[in-house]
Amino acid sequence: MSAAAGNTAIWGRAEQQDFRSRVRGCLLGGAIGDALGAGIEFDSLDAIRKAHGQEGVTDFVSAYGRRGAVTDDTQMTLFTVDGLIRAQVRRDTGAWHPPTDVHRAYLRWAVTQRDWGPDERKTDDGWLAREEWLYSRRAPGRACLSGLGDEVMGTLDKPKNPDSKGCGAVMRSAPFGLLVGWEPQLVFQLAVECAAQTHGHPTGYLAAGAFAVISHSLARGEDLDGAVQKALVHLGTRPGHEETTDALKRALGAVRQGMPTPARVESLGQGWTAEEALSIGVYCALVAEDVRHGLLLAVNHGGDSDSTGAICGNLLGTLHGETALPPVWLVELEGRDTMLQLADDFAMEMTQGPALHGPAGSAPGWLARYPRA
């Protein structure tokens, strides 16, 4: 992607194809990691080995009545993407405040946790909120539910759940990194502001910002180690960064300590808190021999296996693109068609937005999918 006069992004065909592959990889990779961990999320490593053998899980196991089921991690990640697309569409109206659009998307997710199914009368909700399979509670985090329990948006000045540093914000924040036309400090800031809508502790929202910046670097074609170093620089400018900074440094240090093992993963924590989930996901992505190896390492530990698997999958999928993902897992993945549609819509909006909507006219089909209201 190159820049022309007026900072207009010019995308060549190969660049568009590469970007779409990374967006697909991010969403599908995260969902696969989520699904691998969904059935063992609350189990100890000993219990996992007793049930699935010494290597732990090596494939999807049944969760929520099926193989390949995803959790709230993937649900909220998809609504993050929906909110980001809506922000771009609403920009034509002169309304440009992406945190508000992402918050509205999260409120639509919250409805899926309360209602039996979509309300077809709410045409302004857009297409994603009408996907019936999303109307299922998959162990959503308490901070996410309470933070979105009313329509008041948490901000950095007045965050929701000011003491919460659970991983519920970081696990949904990879899509901010797909805003490759943005500067990294703006990506960091947007992710942080949106994280504070549910998680008000500095570690809770700064880990989300760091994850977004790491994903942003990967989406731009940079390597993972350099992406982590860049995130550390951004973290260092923020008050209250110490826990997240230390967690990322521990992940980098663990890489140099020898062969990756579940014990080494567990030395980084259990993943219930934001900084631990980020540390484990980053470590497993750094040492991954391939996507399969990295994801299985990320879920086979006693702790929040689905969230650490999702974070690792987001990273590896963004780094390598969709074609690196194991097809045997893709074919059983819940909601894959929805994810592909959403990924392609996001890539199209980022690369072809002016052709879809603007002052000169808009595609009615696009505005039906992503209403400006």
Language-model features and meaning:
Residues 1-373:
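Structured, active/binding-site neighborhoods that engage oxygen-rich ligands
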